Amino acid sequence: MACNSTSLEAYTYLLLNTSNASDSGSTQLPAPLRISLAIVMLLMTVVGFLGNTVVCIIVYQRPAMRSAINLLLATLAFSDIMLSLCCMPFTAVTLITVRWHFGDHFCRLSATLYWFFVLEGVAILLIISVDRFLIIVQRQDKLNPRRAKVIIAVSWVLSFCIAGPSLTGWTLVEVPARAPQCVLGYTELPADRAYVVTLVVAVFFAPFGVMLCAYMCILNTVRKNAVRVHNQSDSLDLRQLTRAGLRRLQRQQQVSVDLSFKTKAFTTILILFVGFSLCWLPHSVYSLLSVFSQRFYCGSSFYATSTCVLWLSYLKSVFNPIVYCWRIKKFREACIELLPQTFQILPKVPERIRRRIQPSTVYVCNENQSAV
């Protein structure tokens, strides 16, 4: 372990601060708190798996929902599903037992899978953000389902290329019990540190910077468009009600409706971005400190800090389906349809009756309307 190696100074520091490094994890958090966190993490696993599975099922079963944006969202959901299944249960078990029961090789594999699926999820969120920027700011809607599939395939390959070196032993992966999960450990090797910096920049700092700039430009464009549409509507008078004036009025109304739809879609993506930032900023700082600061890595608070930041990073997998259910009406309807009949509180209203109750409802799913 990194805290037991390297130099006399590190050994002296370890004797003074962590007299039993291999068992330090068992003394950092009380047993009731560890068990509670593990139970909550298992619940997060179930909720994240079920919620993201619904997203994938909706896109798979309904051809009208296979637009470019929905394919991207389904890929994001799939990466969260794999993260929930491949990493979270083992972290929960380690939290309870304060021991890693799955071997050193699987420890390194689990750390690689963790970063791999996180990288893919971040890449998809970045692609969606750039697509929203091109549509709203540049007025270029170039992303079709075929191109989306190619971009998704490329993102999987790039994510594996970035996360893969940790599987081959490029950097130190620390086995619990110093942390509730196999994490990047302290190292003084320049190559290992360079890899960790590349990994953290690719996971958080670079996507965060690009998405932040994109959203600032989008907000500015939406604000200007809203002011222009409002001013044009206020300037109408009866003298403009000619044939040309009516056509211009119809175009303005279409712009207003399109602006409203794009603003709502952008708001949903913006909420996902905020959730990503809040969940991953602490983990990114923690990863850098673990590799560069021996005082932090060998300190008595490392286990508690690891538990908190890992728990927060997993929360993002649960956060996305909650946002979909809150913001997307079709997602809520699909959840109700997928529930077994015995668990449905309200009876399902047939489509013909829904048309009579709400005649204005348009049952058309084109590429734009089926997106979030």
UniProtKB/Swiss-Prot annotation:
Expressing tissues: Expressed in brain; detected in the basal forebrain, frontal cortex, and caudate, but not in thalamus, hippocampus, or putamen.
Q: Which residues lie on this side of the membrane: Cytoplasmic?
A: 60-75, 131-149, 220-268, 327-372
Question: Which sequence ranges are listed under topological domain Extracellular?
Answer: 1-38, 97-109, 171-198, 290-305
Give GO BP annotations, semicolon-separated. G protein-coupled receptor signaling pathway
Could you tell me the membrane topology recorded for this protein?
Multi-pass membrane protein
Q: Which GO terms describe its molecular function?
A: G protein-coupled receptor activity
Sites of glycosylation? 4, 17, 20
**Membrane-crossing residues?**
39-59, 76-96, 110-130, 150-170, 199-219, 269-289, 306-326
**Which UniProt keyword terms apply here?**
Cell membrane, G-protein coupled receptor, Glycoprotein, Membrane, Receptor, Transducer, Transmembrane, Transmembrane helix
Gene Ontology CC terms, in alphabetical order: plasma membrane
Q: So which domain of life are we looking at? A: Eukaryota
InterPro entries in alphabetical order: GPC_Orphan_Receptors, GPCR_Rhodpsn, GPCR_Rhodpsn_7TM
Where does the protein end up?
Answer: Cell membrane
**Membership in a protein family:** Belongs to the G-protein coupled receptor 1 family.
Known role: Orphan receptor. May play a role in brain function.
Protein name, as recorded:
Probable G-protein coupled receptor 45
- Native source organism of the sequence: Homo sapiens (Human)
Q: Which gene encodes it?
A: GPR45
